[in-house]
């Protein structure tokens, strides 16, 4: 999404879904994965007559609440949505004015969509043409419509294309920048958005700043450290600007291309140490490779309130340390919700026993590594003390201009926490006559200044900027192929100094665009751009003139820096339709993809995997467990609901293999790996597909490894990880693993 209109975050919010007239859920199961948030979907149905549409390989609990359901083959979401747009264009249901005024490149989409007739879509996706037609007409005629997705769209080799085709569908229908519309990504946990915002990714700095010399120097200035000192922490200066390893493939850095593993480029050295902070290691694919990577480390450190799976599945006998970390109830600070809202959390109890909050452990590490002074320089007071976490919140707000965290203060967020009941759940607006009147709950970013109320719905030009309005971000230049990339006249937030598109605000254009004259003092203090203006003057001046600092551009359907400039269907690496792999092949292999050589077409076309592994494999979640399950499987009551790992298998497929309900079965993958699990025989999956929940750990390929748990820490529920048999495959842009589509074979154990 960030490459479509500037930000890669949920555009609206859960309460706003109640304003939708139709809800298109593709690659998500909110009834199970977001059960509290799902009540907003049900209220939209009950109170607003919204039509609920679900597209999924399984008949899920969300599908059980749907008005319309399509059971799709895993990995074919792009053909389905192109099929929808084929019908939309054919029937003239598109929003022509929105397309003309606020988008670029839809003509290219129109050409591609013409190829995806209902009959072609049926052949590729398995969804009957009549079902596609019915769903498309309902969605097109019931606007505003909201598109909702989660990991079901992203965890594919073409995940980045999936998350572009859904926004393009919304642009075609004019469902963006309106209440009840938008692209509403459901994050897996409450602070996934906050973790993303703070750069828990290897290719950017906090706030999604690119790793280039200008931004590193900006951060050095704001952190009050020497740029040369920062640079000196890298083995060579150029490594300062390179992406690191991803969570999905860190282990490749340990294996270092040896014994047939994919080659790596890591300055001529292998990874020696790993620190795992609150991340379930079994939540990523290729667990046998993860295990090999763990075994090859010299040092493994785990920060967790519970025993991390990494310490259990490894065969290491030394060099493994478990540091007891405090839970969220034993510390305080901010998290960022799925809708970009900040939430303050207060400490409930002091850390128990010898546990410590994460930040204290990391401060101790920084002291021993010799850079505690630099790390804390801007958050220590005159007496060398740190007011935690308030000082950290202020530091973040002062630096991260790019997503507009500038308006967040501890005082504002605490006030919202104390008055959470005084906000309207559908609009997030503070109620009249209260101390939070005029502000949106959690100050959803961008919150440009301390007087700004936050932005509940992104890209809404019907509101003034000082009420959360904005156009699409100007992030991709002023023109492409001779076409102006700025929004048309009349497509700007109401009440602003500009009536149409304008570029992002910089020191050298602010006077012209805003129609102001800067003082010499303001010019001297001001940074070069709105995103690197440490003085805050650009944002303040923009608010006075009703201008969003990041500009007002067109959303683009064509991403000219991507391999696929418009989304293209490419078959999964392990596809049951080798005939379609020849027609819609994967990408060319990609060297140095986050430092690791990554196979695509060479693997996909090397053989017809479906002859030996004829069954589709997809993975997902359960309502009673979370993530890798370290915490939730330690609950006796939650574990009683699903005490053993299982596979959902269709009754006919089970009968074909002589399998009865709750028999043990072996599941084999093309990687040569296997798991032993129970069979749950249910009709919710198709005859050619099995489903695996991924919350278990403690067994590896039939081997009991629970003896590695320290005494008294073994969870109530243990079992095989689904990700032991998840197939090789990684997104071409992000390297997220392809866990939602793969192949396997089954046999009775």
Predicted regions and their residues:
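N-terminal intrinsically disordered, low-complexity segments enriched in P/E/S/T
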Residues: 613-615, 625-627
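Surface-exposed flexible segments
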Residues: 161-168, 627-639
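Long, contiguous, secondary-structure-rich segments that constitute the structural scaffold
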Residues: 358-418, 497, 507-513, 517-525, ...
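Loop-to-helix "switch" segment enriched in basic
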Residues: 212-219
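Extracellular hydrolytic enzyme modules, especially secreted metalloproteases
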Residues: 209-212, 709
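Cofactor-pocket helix-loop regions in the catalytic cores of large enzyme subunits
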Residues: 1-191, 195-200, 219-475, 486-496, ...
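Long, low-complexity, polar/charged, intrinsically disordered or flexibly structured peripheral segments
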Residues: 225-262, 464-604, 608
